[in-house]
Amino acid sequence: MPTYTRLYSDKHGESHFEDVEIDLTLTEYAPPAPPLELSSTTLAKQFGFMQAPAGWSSDWHPSAARNTFFVLSGEWEVTASDGEIRSFPAGSVLRAQDTTGKGHSSRVISDSLAVMVQLED
């Protein structure tokens, strides 16, 4: 089953990573095309592209909004406030939901292009 990574804040303000399985259901999505597997949908507020060069890094910060990042090229490294570090190469999906608390830090390992989708509150 496919997964994505969720970054969230606990009740004490620490951020943590969680691997989330994506539930897919065989769906007649666009007949007469054959059925395909589809997940439930989430409302989105806006989306945009984000590009950063290798070596870019941030200080500790919470996510400005509930965002989902789809890494198209390059690689990001994100550190949760609990100390766990994860890499997000091209093809990765990160749902950043740590909008309160200590947040996380980020750095770009190799020149990166990502799509950022801001979710509805």
What are these language model-derived features?
Residues 10-11, 71:
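Short, acidic, Ser/Thr-enriched surface-loop or helix-capping motifs
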Residues 14-60, 112-121:
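A short glycine-rich, His/Asp/Glu-containing loop-to-beta-strand
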Residues 57, 62, 68-89:
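A short beta-strand-loop-beta hairpin characteristic of the jelly-roll/cupin
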Residues 55-58, 77, 93-95, 99-105:
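Histidine-centered metal-chelating micro-motifs
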Residues 3-9, 16, 103, 107-121:
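Double-stranded beta-helix
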Residues 1-3, 63:
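Short, small/polar residue-rich loop motifs at catalytic or cofactor-binding pockets
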Residues 22-23, 51, 81-99:
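Short acidic-glycine-tyrosine-enriched beta hairpin
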Residues 28, 86, 102-108:
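Short, Lys/Arg- and Gly-enriched loop/turn segments at beta-strand edges
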